[in-house]
């Protein structure tokens, strides 16, 4: 089976639309976050069924909860594996600036969340790296190491020096 579009996302559906999928069995395509940025890929569901994903250019990244296929009694949904991340919570704007600058020099991929997010504080989230953890420990910057399903995958930012 070739999937060429995402039909919707379970996390975005209004409650009354979600009810239409209630009786369906959910077959999962379990993907690590890094695979979400690939438009063309082969995947195997948790039932051992192979599928091809061939999304149109510009269609956006896959996300946790994306509905790939719906049949009579079954649906195929993307399930994203948690990513090992460092959740960095600087105490001051100065500490944030110094930390972001130091980590930015490493061309580290990061995401930023405000206090209204699921983190409950303004934080910077980056993929786990032992050298970053060592820097944070030595600099005294508060952080925690967590396993998280991120709303969007880390993506390399193009640049030149």
From Swiss-Prot:
Leader peptide range in chain numbering: none
One annotated GO biological process: protein folding
One term under GO cellular component: cytoplasm
Single GO MF descriptor: unfolded protein binding
InterPro entries: UreE, UreE_N, UreE_N_sf
Compartment(s) of residence: Cytoplasm
Pfam families: UreE_N (PF02814)
CDD domains for the chain: UreE
Protein name: Urease accessory protein UreE
Top-level lineage group: Bacteria
Homology family: Belongs to the UreE family.
Alphabetized UniProt keyword annotations: Chaperone, Cytoplasm, Nickel
Matches recorded under SMART domains: UreE_N
The organism of origin for this protein: Pseudarthrobacter chlorophenolicus (strain ATCC 700700 / DSM 12829 / CIP 107037 / JCM 12360 / KCTC 9906 / NCIMB 13794 / A6) (Arthrobacter chlorophenolicus)
Role played: Involved in urease metallocenter assembly. Binds nickel. Probably functions as a nickel donor during metallocenter assembly.
């Amino acid at each position: 089976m070739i999937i060429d579009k995402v039909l919707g996302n379970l996390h975005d559906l209004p409650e009354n639309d979600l009810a239409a999928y209630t009786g369906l069995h959910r077959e999962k395509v379990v993907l690590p976050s890094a695979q979400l940025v690939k438009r063309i890929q082969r995947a195997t569901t948790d039932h051992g069924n192979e599928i091809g994903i061939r999304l149109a250019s510009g269609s956006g990244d896959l996300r946790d909860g994306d509905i790939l296929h719906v049949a009579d009694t079954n649906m195929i949904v993307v399930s994203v594996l948690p990513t090992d991340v460092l959740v960095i919570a600087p105490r001051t704007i100065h500490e944030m600036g110094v930390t972001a600058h130091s980590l930015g020099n490493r061309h580290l991929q990061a995401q930023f969340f405000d206090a209204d997010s699921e983190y409950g504080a303004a934080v910077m989230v980056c993929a786990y790296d032992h050298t970053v953890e060592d820097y944070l420990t030595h600099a005294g910057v508060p952080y925690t190491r967590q396993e998280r399903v991120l709303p969007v995958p880390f993506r390399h930012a193009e640049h030149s020096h």
